[in-house]
Amino acid sequence: LAQSTRHPGQPLRVLIVADTFPPDINGASRFTERLAGGLVRNGNNVHIIAPATSKAWGTFTEIQDGVEMTVHRIRSYPLVIHKTLRFVNPLTLKNKVDLILDEFEPDAIHSQSHLSVGRVLARSGRERGIRLIATNHTMPENLLKYLHLPKFLEKRVKAKLWKDAGKVLSKYDQITTPTRRAAELLEAAAGIENVLAISCGIDATKFTNSTKTTNNPFRVLFLGRLDWEKHVHNLLKAAAKLPKEIDFFIEIAGDGSQKKYLADLARELKISTRVKFLGHISEEELPLAYERATVFAMPSIAELQSIATMEAMASGRPVIAANAMALPHLVHHGDNGYLFEPDDVDDFSACLLKVATADQKELNRLSENSIHLIQSHDIKRTLSIFEGLYRGDQDARQNSDDNSEDYMKPIGRLSIVVRRAELKVRRQALAALGKITDLGDEIKDGLEEIGQDVKRQAKKVDKQVRTGVKKTVGKAKKAIKRLDE
């Protein structure tokens, strides 16, 4: 990356480009909003280019993430195949983008998607010598379901979509993605190199609470888009398999194409009275939803990180998640929750049961480990890395702390060596206890024998005493009689 003309500490001019932005509610949208908000709070000048979600398009001053920022809303049209994706006319897009670039003159462009607006910005930004950063939040697998392609075409189309992603992203100076697992996938599937793993980050203080995790009642929360790849239907099926004595409730926050299907499924499974669909919830309601929950569930099979899961962890809640994509990066099996095999409803249900029947000590342990793990995802660190990339600082080209080797080490479970040693000590203790028990029986028998001897001796002494007393009394009487005479 070229060195910036602005010195460290000087405000940056950053243009963030996104295909999804609030009021859209999804992980990419929320990250973009919080990234922009954090940059503004750090004193930088931030503009956003994003599709308009209504008939009002143009340039607006909007309050996002609690701060003012300039948002350029591009005229767009809803896609029939997907509830949240929107189509922007590529024939008119470049002219609009070029006008914004010439007027704003950004130090860096940070694209959050290569599909639409980010595709055009790559070309326009390169023409002007602007530093280009791209963060990938997209998996082609998530799009295939909505194309309704024949099975035999899916593999071929998926390969073409990945190739297209590589073609667009390779025009950027630096590519990032939220986790090391997602970076490895992007490098292998799209044919690009040196992808940085930088966590989306989170301001954990927004979700801190003093409420202990409790499973009485047992409350499960899911928050996210209600679309196919989230596999929320597996949550309902797994909950329906819980023993009848488990008094469970499920709260589902979010909206999407699967909402009606999920409501129908809950009725079919005869658990509709235990399932509540919250719809979209406000930023003020969000921490309260996590605080109410016993456990957060994320059954999705296509998460490149999952901001909702990080929010649950920051709230001190255990997490049960599918053992797929980047979720094992957040959920350390047995430490702060449990992983189940994707689409294995029985395994999912067994994980739910573990938390539902855990004692308070175990719930506290899981909760504390969630809080411990989320500390590596501090958004201040994320902002610092990106600001360095915007300036062209070579030292900024590094992964975030959660992608270090130490982060993945177990924290709540013992290593195999230590566990074996502990088992050996337990066995020795049990053996010693057995010997003590045997010895105790011998002592008991001995004491009983002593007790019987004591009783016999006591009777003998009593007899002797009584006889002695009688003799003494008799002698005393004779002595008194002699005195009287």
Which role does the model predict for each range below?
Residues 1-73, 411, 415-436, 440-443:
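N-terminal subdomain of nucleotide-sugar transferases
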Residues 52, 181, 201:
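Carbohydrate-associated surface elements
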Residues 169, 280-281, 288-293:
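Short alpha-helical donor nucleotide-sugar binding micro-motif in glycosyltransferases
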Residues 301:
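Aromatic "clamp/platform" in nucleotide-sugar-dependent glycosyltransferases that forms part
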Residues 318-321:
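Short hydrophobic beta-strand element within catalytic cores of glycosyltransferases
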Residues 347, 361-376, 388:
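A short, well-ordered alpha-helix in the C-terminal region of glycosyltransferases
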